[in-house]
């Protein structure tokens, strides 16, 4: 194969991927490949509990450690974020409560990895551990402790929609079948772990982020909102990306945390996450229980289709607030179905992942 760009052409001309040559030759630079002289190392302290109140956080020893340039907690992040304005219920660093094992509690920026790790070890956090529920059904049971105070039944959002007369459609069917399907939680397992390089500009009081995202403009908006600065003070650059598959279609907490650390340290911070942390921060396909009912005529025509879906949406709304709509919006496919009924409940469950 030639490593030269293809000649211009149309039909019949072999056209490789526009970025393929850079990738196969190793010229492509990913976020973790970017080097910034003097960059500090960012690290995140995460909750060991699935659900707990934060009673107290003491960062004084970490702040006093030589080589530490910044320490941030939930006190530095008063603005929540989320994929939609109706579901902004997550903070970059936990405030008052943690809602999954791995929820970010504090973050540090230090001169090197060893110093950053020592600083994390010096941060003291007192927790009041609360009940945790690891299935959607358990979280929805009567008497279950609310994960979010404004959602006492742990149901994030209910979706109910009907098009046509489903009852009449089932009555007219020659055959009605019902079946329940259980879909396991799936992590996208993209090859590149999460990473952000955040640079603070003292002259314009702004930040520039190079980050592993599929949606740089969305990251731009959320970083500005959480840092409480103008959008014009934030620049987001998307380098080559080692996979995403939907897991990086929203702003994630580590991107905002990197920006916070860079601003507080008034410098540059590289925040590289381990594979375990990337799994903890993932926005994978949620566990979903689907009960489907279909009405058919003898000639194969569908008379009605009904779906009930219960989804373990995780500790925060995230993209799940949209995913639950897909369970119904996409179920008809290319078929001619005169009546469709869709009922869905995404719920919040404190768990091992977000």
Q: What residues fall within each predicted segment?
A:
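Alpha-helical support elements that line or immediately flank enzyme active sites
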Residues: 44-72, 106-127, 196-265, 322-332
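Flexible, low-hydrophobicity surface segments
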Residues: 1-157, 176-179
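Flexible hinge/switch segments at interdomain interfaces of large molecular machines
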Residues: 31-40, 191-194, 339-352
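Glycine-rich and small/hydrophobic secondary-structure elements
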Residues: 89-116, 246-298, 354
